[in-house]
Regions:
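Active-site scaffold of zinc-dependent metalloenzymes
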Residues: 82-132, 142
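Second-shell loop/turn segments in exported
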Residues: 56-66, 117-122, 127, 158-165
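Short active-site segment of divalent metal-dependent hydrolases/proteases
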Residues: 137-141
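Long, charge-rich low-complexity segments
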Residues: 211-229
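Post-HExxH zinc-binding segment in Zn-dependent metallohydrolases
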Residues: 144-146, 151-204, 208
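Bacterial N-terminal signal peptides
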Residues: 5-16
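N-terminal low-structure segments adjacent to metalloprotease catalytic domains
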Residues: 19-55
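Auxiliary, metal-adjacent structural segments of Zn-dependent hydrolase domains
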Residues: 21-22, 46-105, 185
């Protein structure tokens, strides 16, 4: 038994073992109650027909993710050789203007994807998957590097760019890994699509993409691979 135990421990320490573990399961759900309460709190009503459209299209959103999302998460893990720190998570979709999409709690604002809101990505279903992938990567990368000072202690690149805004720094490793995933699966056009979706959000995102362009994605990915848990 002692020999078997040593063998099992050795297997978990071998490179590539993390990549063989399953990616986390991402569930997608919706409750109109959140939109009602949130819209009331921010003083902006839910767009007419938006809640009804989400209810009608919820299964569509789930199918979109089921078709492409797991492959993206698995590829990210294969690239970093780091396991996910969670097995399952729930993404709550909503349309409240008070909350953008975020990773913790995992909220996906679907205004951009609805006909009721004249969303710019209503005919780009892959961008819903990209948004959910983006937010899930935030949690994944926090689990690898940690947050704040802990992340900086593990990343020479974060120390190099310590004067940048928190939003910019939080997106450096993410943009690099996201881009590498799309290249790995043969969808380099999605790198351009993700960039085009990010840039209108604000200058912090513009700066993050510029830094990753300057440094290249590989140095950031290498830090994720070498980070000790």
């Amino acid at each position: 038994m002692r020999g078997l135990g040593a063998l099992l421990i050795g297997l978990f320490l071998l490179p590539g073992v993390a990549a063989s573990r399953p990616a986390p399961r991402v569930l997608i759900d919706y409750t109109p109650v959140f939109d009602r309460l949130c819209s009331r709190a921010v003083g902006t009503p839910t767009p007419p027909g938006a809640s009804e459209e989400i209810v009608t299209r919820l299964e569509e959103f789930r199918r979109l993710w089921a078709h492409s999302g797991p492959r993206l998460l698995e590829t990210a893990q294969a690239i970093t050789d780091q396991p996910y720190g969670f097995r399952e998570t729930v993404a709550a979709v909503h349309v409240c203007p008070g909350f953008a999409s975020m990773s913790l709690p995992l909220l996906i604002n679907v205004r951009l994807f609805l006909r009721a809101t004249n969303g710019r990505f209503v005919d780009r279903p892959e961008m819903f998957v990209d948004t959910l992938f983006h937010e899930t990567l935030h949690t994944y990368i926090r689990g690898i590097l940690g947050a704040g000072d802990k992340a900086a202690s593990r990343s020479a690149l974060l120390r190099k760019y310590a004067e940048e805004t928190l939003v910019t720094r939080n997106h450096l490793h993410l943009i690099a890994l996201q881009s590498e995933v799309y290249r790995r699966i043969g969808q380099p056009e999605m790198v351009d699509a993700a960039r085009a979706a990010d840039l209108p959000i604000g200058p912090d995102y513009v700066r993050a993409w510029k830094i990753v362009d300057t440094e290249g994605a590989q140095p950031f990915v290498a830090e994720l691979r070498s980070a000790a848990r």
